[in-house]
Amino acid sequence: MKTGALTTFLALCLPVTVFATTLRLSNEVDLLVLDGKKVSSSLLRGAESIELENGPHQLVFRVEKTIRLPGNEERLYISPPLVISFDTQLISQVNFQLPRLENEREASHFNAAPRLALLDGDAMPIPVKLDILAITSTAKVVDYEIETERYNKSAKRASLPQFATMMADDSTLLSDVSELDTVPPQSQTLTEQRLKYWFRLADPQTRHHFLQWAEKQPPS
């Protein structure tokens, strides 16, 4: 897709519905999957927030933070993938509140029994269900979307089965075809629909930065 066409395409992707919940992102949280869909890290890189509709949501993420080691050394701590489900029906803002993670002991405790909170815009706790996402694949590169689908079908603590059935074959993404869409090959269709989805969720500043980046890319 040429850059100019990509920019026009993304501009037309601006949401026509009004989102009611702002999820504030944290630089210590690596978001992997949202509501059964793999997160587009390139589009959301540097984003401060994403917009969500009211209702149930599920995040798969890792906590990443530099911790201290003996001898004044440091290392990057990366938690196991976590699943958290919550409902934003009456909530306008969601914020992460992470526990203290400064050293190996605290990191080990978090690995064994992770705990964190989601707070609303008034700093009040939001009811959540939190669990560790057990990885079943032995592949070097983990497909977190597939792992999340398996988790949601297994009736675990933070499972939301509706996201497993909706996202199993990208049927939701592919069904949202307007008169502006052509009928490209399947792989291109998936790429464009996923890009459209994440562009809709990104905050205005992130959209602007992404469009600026797209304008600078050479034609394919």
From Swiss-Prot:
Signal peptide location: 1-20
Top-level taxon: Bacteria
Record's keyword terms, sorted: Signal
InterPro entries recorded: UPF0319
Family the entry assigns: Belongs to the UPF0319 family.
Record-given protein name: UPF0319 protein YccT
Species: Salmonella newport (strain SL254)
